[in-house]
Amino acid sequence: MNPQLARRPAATLLALSCALSPSFAAAKDLGEDDFLSRSRRLTYEGRRSGEGYFSADGRYMVFQSERRADNPFYQIYLMDFETGETSEVSLGTGKTTCAFLRPGSNEILFSSTHHDPESLRWQQEELDFRASGKERRYSWDYDPEMDVYAVDRETGEQKRLTNARGYDAEAGYSPDGEWIVFSSMRDAYERELSAEEQKTLEVDPAYFGEIYIMKADGTEQKRLTSVPGYDGGPFFFPDGERIIWRRFSENGLTADVWSMKTDGTDQRQLTDFGSMSWAPYVHPSGEYIFFASNKLGFSNFEVFIVDVAGTKEPVQVTYTDGFDGLPVPTPDGKQLVWTSSRHKGEGGQLYIANWNHERALEALAEAPPRQDN
């Protein structure tokens, strides 16, 4: 998904900016240095980069970046931490997003529209718009042509895993590599919508996003959620027993972190933060969850952690104005990669820092009980 706030109607955004309150206050004795050390920028090339995810051994990181001269949209890249080399994984055509490395395999998962015969036209239209000098707020369009693919990084062989009208993306493998969880908006295209639903689809297609699960070969696709509002950004817990994701409220004003069993049962709300809380990812220890939230200001996203049961108030991790989000720990839990605009550039870039796991546990133990909003 995009490394910024998901697109919302203007009226909703205005209401959200009014709804956010400064009631949350980070502990006075905590700061970014408590959790992060030796922060450094990983990506420099391109207009923007984000969403970095690791191979099981930590050697590779897959991410998305806008860096091709002939395509203004995200493409997928693989960074090798041993050699320092970065290579393009996707095909260079269309839009791509949300890559993930399959454990025990050379396969890389991502979503793409390269099969769309209109892809080159959309690319040229966007290139022409940017060349005109005009500007617009960055947004994500939830392209209904987006489908999930798996590509072998050695042979280049690709497999199309979904083929449904509607945005299929935000996919990740289970720890054993046998299952894939993803978000889909196919429901809006598979049935006849009411007049009100059709209007919603035209304004905010993300409203129809739901969580699905399937086998790694694309078979046995099953819907797990059926709640009005955008459900997306799912990942498996380290033990593979549960799924973490974020759920937007029906009116799109807020989002919170949830977890459930892999069959869709036992759905639990883990945050009640009264803001946009999204992009959750579980620490390898299984003891707490990283996520991003704009609790401190409409356009100021920071990284937070919350205990895995959601019994405590979240603890703030980053303290830098702008965008800090999409946090993902390395497989050994000793480092954290996230997307940030702290360099004051045009778009987000990837950063990495050493992670203080012990201090995180201490801070969560000291956090007050969760308050309902």
Regions found by a protein language model. Give the residues of each.
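Bacterial N-terminal signal peptides that target proteins for export
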Residues: 2-13
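Multi-bladed beta-propeller domains
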Residues: 27-47, 79-95, 151-166, 214-230, ...
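A flexible loop/linker signature enriched in serine peptidases of the S9 family
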Residues: 46-47, 64-75, 91-96, 111-148, ...
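Residue-level detector of Asp-centered blade-edge/turn motifs that repeat once per structural unit
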Residues: 56-57, 103-104, 175-176, 238-239, ...
